């Protein structure tokens, strides 16, 4: 679907032409999983897949939302003075949430608007379709209402939508990667301080492949919040030994001197701490052009997520183990929260087709339904895009 078609559909649905167009990417996390809410480091990048929006301000206080991904929902109309979450509004709650959070922060959004959304991120695949929607609405509101929002503040508002409005206790990585992404670069983020560094991703001769299990995962209904609680309990136990504010401040050398009474909490903490160290090592490996070492760190990350953090499951393990068995694979791991969703692999360019065929066959044989495969391109963060046909 071209952007011109989006404009035509906007006019069909809302009766007037749109005035602005916006895009926010999805994201993958190359390494650093379940570290963001533990005060550690993550290493995500923005994708060229994402969420498109076209919009127009209104003269009244009504907000109208329409998504081509949920056409059966029709136009969702909301009064500007009633932005409380409603289950019947589904996806539109993320848009309502951003309006609500910005108003609460003191930004003036005194009239309504019409918004048409089209996402090309598979919903529920773990590529941050919800954070992409939050950020495309954020940049849209910033432009339409001349709010002049600092970009890192906008990232934080996106997280507030997730945490306080939707009720999912997520970290800040997804919104940060989507708001701050840069084409051709990964982004090393310290989730404790929000210090960040761009790292050029020179994967010449290799392709990033996203492997979707096609097993839906609902973050709010998964064991995600349970893992957060377990990490908080593990940190409280560890604070008897060192007064660190987060697991991300611990080193593995320090951790290995501690005896745990609860083996489950020990494993959860071991993952958070070791994964943080792997993420920093991965940045060094990329800087030094040691791609094989980077791939080995990806593999170790998946093993830790499987054994110590227990967030992979049969589908993700089947994909990743099949990927490891193929020639020309630097590394492979699950990405995102887990419990289904996606894995990623870095594969030699000339083996991409045979890789997808072989892994797809192994997966469908074991699981009983097919996986989906996408080649990923690293793109820029959330932004207004020009009003030209592409």
Curated annotation (Swiss-Prot):
The keyword Magnesium applies. Its EC number is 2.7.1.6. GO terms for cellular component: cytosol. InterPro entries: Galactokinase, Galactokinase_bac, Galactokinase_CS, GalKase_N, GHMP_kinase_C_dom, GHMP_kinase_C_sf, GHMP_kinase_N_dom, GHMP_knse_ATP-bd_CS. ATP binds at residues 67, 124-130. The record marks 27 as: Transition state stabilizer. This is Galactokinase. It comes from Exiguobacterium sibiricum (strain DSM 17290 / CCUG 55495 / CIP 109462 / JCM 13490 / 255-15). The lineage of its organism: Bacteria, Bacillati, Bacillota, Bacilli, Bacillales. The gene is galK.
